[in-house]
């Protein structure tokens, strides 16, 4: 599917923003300012447009989860408790947000393993590094999502659109889709008090799959070196 440079640039800007928000929501618990500006008045506004990508059910699920949360007396603190339960405890009862926890054949790969080293290689190849105040290994889910935001934004001005699209699709398949479905499954099994984070995980998986399909369509037969 050929795109004009204007269409590609617009898509890149929109995609970068979405990946940036997903990265932020997994990097840390929702702050009070973010809760007030993006959760307190309804569904999560930055993701509303994803319903147009055949993700209406996932968006509606997230909106319903946020509505249930908002009925609580201290909703942001409840959400923070769910964040801790899901992402900060041991792997037996939570959904660890690290690729190394899911990429082994037996589901018991050591943390800081090959997946973490591979993500550091991706960062180095892109001339990027993890922010000093983010004290997590490189295979934390927020890292490839943040890198994808950078790639989508930087490639919006690329002259060779098919090659840029193919490179991004290859990165998503290798660094994200290789383990994201298993992480999403664990999020559903962990059963936190509210459905916000399980719903968010399902929406993320649907978005990444839709984005890869879009990039493959744009990239066509372009080779990725």
What are these regions (language model features)?
Residues 1-225:
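Surface/interface-facing alpha-helical segments and adjacent flexible terminal/loop regions used
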